[in-house]
C-alpha cells in the first residue's frame, strides 16, 4: 500500500503479511465509542516503504502509524512495522490527558528472527503515588495473575526502568513456530483485550482533576516519555531501515512527542 492511500492517521492500516493486524483492529474498534479524532501525523510518518537485507536479496519494509485522540486521551498511537523474516512489530501506546488521573496503556508485540518479545502493561505516571496507582492495580493484578501463569517469564526489568512499569507488567519471550503461534492466539490476544478493556473502563470513569493535580501528572508524563524516547529499543532497527534523521524525528516528533506537544 502506498502512502497516498492513507491520508489520515485514522485511516486503516493494512500491511500484507503483518501478523499483528488483529490486535490493531481490536483496539481501533474498542476506541470507536470514545469518538476519536485523527491525531496530526506528518505524511512521511503515516506510511513509509524501505528495504533491508542485502543488495542481492532485499527485503521490503513497511512502517505505518495509526493514531487518534479523544477528550480524555491526548494521543493514542500504534507504530506498525513489517519486514518479513527480519521483524514484525506492533507498538501501541495510549497517552492520557494530564487533566485525568490515568496511567499509560502500553503494548509491545515484537517478532524477530530469534523469537517473539511480548509485553503488556498499564504503566504508572507516578509509581510512588498510591492515589494514582492503587485504584488501577487492584483491578489489574487479577488479570496479570490469570495470564502470567500461562506464559514463560521474560526476565528481569532493568533497575532504571522499574519506575515506569506496574507490578502487573506482563512480559514474555516465546519461540517462533507453532508453539509461539498457539500462545499468541490463546494467551496474548485475550490478555491484550483484557488489559485494553480495563484501561478503557478507567477512561470512561475518569473525572477531571484540579489544576495542581494536572501539573503533577504532566510532570510524571514528561518523565515517562523522555525515558521512553531515550531508551527506545526500536531505534537501531528503524535507523537501519530509514536512516538516523527520519528515525529521530519519528521517535521524538511522533512516538514520544509530549515535550513538543505540551
Swiss-Prot record:
Pfam families on file: Fe_bilin_red
Keyword check for Oxidoreductase: yes
The organism's place on the tree of life at top rank: Bacteria
Record-linked InterPro entries: Ferredoxin-dep_bilin_Rdtase, Phycoerythrobilin_Fdx_Rdtase
Entry EC number(s): 1.3.7.3
Listed GO biological process terms: phytochromobilin biosynthetic process
Keyword tags: Oxidoreductase
GO molecular-function terms, A-Z: cobalt ion binding; phycoerythrobilin:ferredoxin oxidoreductase activity
Enzymatic reactions: (3Z)-phycoerythrobilin + oxidized 2[4Fe-4S]-[ferredoxin] = 15,16-dihydrobiliverdin + reduced 2[4Fe-4S]-[ferredoxin] + 2 H(+)
Role noted for this protein: Catalyzes the two-electron reduction of the C2 and C3(1) diene system of 15,16-dihydrobiliverdin.
Entry similarity comment: Belongs to the HY2 family.
Protein name listed in UniProt: Phycoerythrobilin:ferredoxin oxidoreductase
Organism: Parasynechococcus marenigrum (strain WH8102)
Gene name tied to this protein: pebB
Amino acid at each position: 500500500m502506498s502512502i497516498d492511500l492513507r491520508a489520515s492517521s485514522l485511516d486503516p492500516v493494512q500491511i500484507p503479511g503483518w501478523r499483528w493486524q488483529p490486535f490493531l483492529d481490536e483496539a481501533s474498534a474498542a476506541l470507536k465509542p470514545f469518538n476519536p479524532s485523527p491525531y496530526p501525523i506528518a505524511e512521511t510518518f503515516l506510511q513509509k516503504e524501505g528495504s533491508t537485507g542485502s543488495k542481492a536479496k532485499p527485503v521490503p519494509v513497511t512502517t505505518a502509524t495509526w493514531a487518534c485522540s479523544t477528550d480524555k486521551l491526548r494521543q493514542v498511537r500504534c507504530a506498525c512495522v513489517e519486514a518479513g523474516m527480519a521483524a514484525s512489530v506492533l507498538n501501541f501506546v495510549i497517552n492520557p490527558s494530564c487533566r485525568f488521573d490515568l496511567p499509560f496503556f502500553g503494548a509491545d508485540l515484537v517478532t524477530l528472527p530469534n523469537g517473539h518479545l511480548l509485553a503488556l502493561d498499564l504503566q504508572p505516571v507516578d509509581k510512588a503515588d498510591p492515589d494514582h496507582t492503587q485504584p488501577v492495580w487492584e483491578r489489574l493484578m487479577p488479570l496479570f495473575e490469570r495470564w502470567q501463569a500461562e506464559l514463560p517469564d521474560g526476565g528481569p526489568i532493568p533497575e532504571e526502568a522499574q519506575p515506569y512499569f506496574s507490578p502487573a507488567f506482563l512480559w514474555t519471550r516465546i519461540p517462533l513456530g507453532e508453539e509461539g503461534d498457539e500462545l499468541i492466539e490463546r494467551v496474548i490476544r485475550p490478555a491484550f483485550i483484557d488489559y485494553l478493556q480495563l484501561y478503557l473502563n478507567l477512561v470512561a470513569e475518569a473525572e477531571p482533576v484540579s489544576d495542581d493535580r494536572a501539573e503533577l501528572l504532566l510532570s510524571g508524563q514528561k518523565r515517562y516519555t523522555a525515558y521512553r524516547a531515550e531508551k527506545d529499543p526500536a531505534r537501531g532497527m528503524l535507523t537501519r531501515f530509514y536512516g538516523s534523521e527520519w528515525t529521530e524525528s519519528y521517535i521524538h516528533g511522533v512516538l514520544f512527542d509530549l515535550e513538543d506537544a505540551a
